[in-house]
């Protein structure tokens, strides 16, 4: 993938392949029928329940990686739900945040010229340690695909790891350091964000505690398309 100029600031470096989702199983696998009728097994880079987005018969796009060492040549990247493309590759948001930090995607993170990935904090790892003229800040990133109406929600299942990250960020903030949590809303049809209390009540409670402690929440919207990804700015937080 590479940078692109124009309306989509981030473009896929090679064309994606269109198909139709036939099934998803064993969390990591998906049966897809390509446009030419070929039936293939694709890697599903999302181990969560994919609430509301794993719809059999829906159009999908796959990236193709024909390297001999790979067991599966195709990776499922996005699915179309109610006319909206939703990014499902959970490995992409962290890479795009890293990429976007260099290109001014996040005005809230201006003043940080250096970043370190996967920083140990207590017994956990935080995605980024940012440093620069603005000081230092710890930043955790969460991929968000579940939506009810125009509201994005996270998580869509109980996440003890996510709970621990919130506890760590609260502790970081209590120590006087800046702490941020960026929810990567991987679809363009959401204008609001809320914690997924229905699926993980404890996470929702910790989310509110983190807000009160001064942890900065950035529910960041993007528009996903078969050619690339465009930043849309922040959604409104609803608690």
Curated annotation (Swiss-Prot):
> What GO molecular function annotations does the UniProt record carry, in alphabetical order?
DNA binding
- Please name the Pfam families in this protein's record: SfsA, SfsA_N
The protein, known as: Sugar fermentation stimulation protein homolog
Q: Which intervals of the chain form a coiled coil?
A: none
Q: Which family does it belong to?
A: Belongs to the SfsA family.
Annotated NCBIfam families: sfsA
